């Protein structure tokens, strides 16, 4: 900040956007190769380059914000707007999945037997694993709020405890969802019911994994004293994202599991 007279962060040239774009190309091409030719080589290469890009890019962001002081109040304001717009774009993504579900279920075609769930589909009981999943995610929403309040009050130990509980609940949710998929009496290829169910819940499951990763990074950063009560946007963004994942699950549970069954 010694050589500039403004509060904005002029980012240095970085290779990570380019490697990120290349890894995305490799992953999507790898998915096609996996689906059509049962070869995972390209997919594994894409995933590896993606993980390396994420690690090194976020490492640079942490250095710039925590150690070099580039994240001034003005820069943080821009990051907040960016995170809000990102979450809005995710809301629109899920809107598409809900649209597909309601379009198919509110007026079932004769091919589906004129009923919902379609003829031959045995839906999951919403009062079993899905209800447990709901309570797990709601509990994690409480614990992440506890972590945020503890951080604001400067209580580091409580913040770490609450954050650890949130991460554990996120991992537990993922394991429950995986077991539910494994035991489900229908598959993604079982017509429109299977495809809308697995795409919507699977995409949400992916968001839980991303959110858990975000929180794990925050946990290790807090172990190294990176957050203070007035400088912690990395954690705040993770908390916003986690609450978004919570709310989406409530809509999924009510729509697909409860009403849709």
Swiss-Prot record:
<feature type="topological domain" description="Mitochondrial matrix">
    <location>
        <begin position="67"/>
        <end position="72"/>
    </location>
</feature>
<dbReference type="GO" id="GO:0005743">
    <property type="term" value="C:mitochondrial inner membrane"/>
</dbReference>
<feature type="topological domain" description="Mitochondrial matrix">
    <location>
        <begin position="1"/>
        <end position="15"/>
    </location>
</feature>
<dbReference type="GO" id="GO:0004129">
    <property type="term" value="F:cytochrome-c oxidase activity"/>
</dbReference>
<dbReference type="GO" id="GO:0008535">
    <property type="term" value="P:respiratory chain complex IV assembly"/>
</dbReference>
<protein>
    <recommendedName>
        <fullName>Cytochrome c oxidase subunit 3</fullName>
        <ecNumber>7.1.1.9</ecNumber>
    </recommendedName>
</protein>
<dbReference type="GO" id="GO:0006123">
    <property type="term" value="P:mitochondrial electron transport, cytochrome c to oxygen"/>
</dbReference>
<feature type="transmembrane region" description="Helical; Name=VII">
    <location>
        <begin position="233"/>
        <end position="256"/>
    </location>
</feature>
<feature type="topological domain" description="Mitochondrial intermembrane">
    <location>
        <begin position="257"/>
        <end position="261"/>
    </location>
</feature>
<keyword id="KW-1133">Transmembrane helix</keyword>
<feature type="transmembrane region" description="Helical; Name=IV">
    <location>
        <begin position="129"/>
        <end position="152"/>
    </location>
</feature>
<comment type="subunit">
    <text>Component of the cytochrome c oxidase (complex IV, CIV), a multisubunit enzyme composed of 14 subunits. The complex is composed of a catalytic core of 3 subunits MT-CO1, MT-CO2 and MT-CO3, encoded in the mitochondrial DNA, and 11 supernumerary subunits COX4I, COX5A, COX5B, COX6A, COX6B, COX6C, COX7A, COX7B, COX7C, COX8 and NDUFA4, which are encoded in the nuclear genome.</text>
</comment>
<keyword id="KW-0496">Mitochondrion</keyword>
<feature type="topological domain" description="Mitochondrial matrix">
    <location>
        <begin position="224"/>
        <end position="232"/>
    </location>
</feature>
<keyword id="KW-0812">Transmembrane</keyword>
<feature type="transmembrane region" description="Helical; Name=II">
    <location>
        <begin position="41"/>
        <end position="66"/>
    </location>
</feature>
<feature type="topological domain" description="Mitochondrial intermembrane">
    <location>
        <begin position="35"/>
        <end position="40"/>
    </location>
</feature>
<comment type="function">
    <text>Component of the cytochrome c oxidase, the last enzyme in the mitochondrial electron transport chain which drives oxidative phosphorylation. The respiratory chain contains 3 multisubunit complexes succinate dehydrogenase (complex II, CII), ubiquinol-cytochrome c oxidoreductase (cytochrome b-c1 complex, complex III, CIII) and cytochrome c oxidase (complex IV, CIV), that cooperate to transfer electrons derived from NADH and succinate to molecular oxygen, creating an electrochemical gradient over the inner membrane that drives transmembrane transport and the ATP synthase.</text>
</comment>
<feature type="transmembrane region" description="Helical; Name=VI">
    <location>
        <begin position="191"/>
        <end position="223"/>
    </location>
</feature>
<dbReference type="InterPro" id="IPR033945">
    <property type="entry name" value="Cyt_c_oxase_su3_dom"/>
</dbReference>
<keyword id="KW-1278">Translocase</keyword>
<dbReference type="GO" id="GO:0045277">
    <property type="term" value="C:respiratory chain complex IV"/>
</dbReference>
<comment type="similarity">
    <text>Belongs to the cytochrome c oxidase subunit 3 family.</text>
</comment>
<feature type="transmembrane region" description="Helical; Name=III">
    <location>
        <begin position="73"/>
        <end position="105"/>
    </location>
</feature>
<dbReference type="InterPro" id="IPR000298">
    <property type="entry name" value="Cyt_c_oxidase-like_su3"/>
</dbReference>
<keyword id="KW-0999">Mitochondrion inner membrane</keyword>
<feature type="topological domain" description="Mitochondrial intermembrane">
    <location>
        <begin position="184"/>
        <end position="190"/>
    </location>
</feature>
<feature type="transmembrane region" description="Helical; Name=V">
    <location>
        <begin position="156"/>
        <end position="183"/>
    </location>
</feature>
<feature type="topological domain" description="Mitochondrial matrix">
    <location>
        <begin position="153"/>
        <end position="155"/>
    </location>
</feature>
<keyword id="KW-0472">Membrane</keyword>
<dbReference type="InterPro" id="IPR024791">
    <property type="entry name" value="Cyt_c/ubiquinol_Oxase_su3"/>
</dbReference>
<feature type="topological domain" description="Mitochondrial intermembrane">
    <location>
        <begin position="106"/>
        <end position="128"/>
    </location>
</feature>
<feature type="transmembrane region" description="Helical; Name=I">
    <location>
        <begin position="16"/>
        <end position="34"/>
    </location>
</feature>
<dbReference type="InterPro" id="IPR013833">
    <property type="entry name" value="Cyt_c_oxidase_su3_a-hlx"/>
</dbReference>
<dbReference type="InterPro" id="IPR035973">
    <property type="entry name" value="Cyt_c_oxidase_su3-like_sf"/>
</dbReference>
<dbReference type="Pfam" id="PF00510">
    <property type="entry name" value="COX3"/>
</dbReference>
């Amino acid at each position: 900040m010694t050589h500039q007279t403004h509060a904005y962060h002029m980012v240095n040239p970085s290779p990570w956007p380019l490697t990120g774009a290349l890894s995305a190309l490799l992953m999507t091409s790898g998915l096609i190769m996996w689906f059509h030719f049962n070869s995972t080589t390209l997919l594994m290469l894409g995933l590896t380059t993606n993980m390396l890009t994420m690690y090194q890019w976020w490492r640079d962001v942490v250095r710039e914000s925590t150690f070099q002081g580039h994240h001034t109040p003005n820069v943080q304001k821009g990051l907040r707007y960016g995170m809000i717009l990102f979450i809005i774009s995710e809301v629109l993504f899920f809107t598409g999945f809900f649209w597909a579900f309601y379009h198919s279920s509110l007026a079932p075609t004769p091919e589906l037997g004129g009923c919902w769930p379609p003829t031959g589909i045995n839906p999951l009981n919403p009062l079993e694993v899905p209800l447990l999943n709901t309570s797990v995610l709601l509990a994690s929403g409480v614990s992440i709020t506890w972590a945020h309040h503890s951080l604001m009050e400067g209580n580091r130990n409580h913040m770490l405890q609450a954050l650890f509980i949130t991460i554990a609940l996120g991992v537990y949710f993922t394991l429950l969802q995986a077991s539910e998929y494994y035991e489900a009496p229908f598959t993604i290829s079982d017509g429109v019911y299977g495809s809308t169910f697995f795409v919507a819940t699977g995409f949400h499951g992916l968001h839980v994994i991303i959110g858990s990763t975000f929180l794990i990074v925050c946990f290790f950063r807090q172990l190294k004293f990176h957050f203070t009560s007035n400088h912690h946007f990395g954690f705040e963004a993770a908390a916003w994202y986690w609450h978004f994942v919570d709310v989406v699950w409530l809509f999924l549970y009510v729509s697909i599991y409860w009403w849709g069954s």
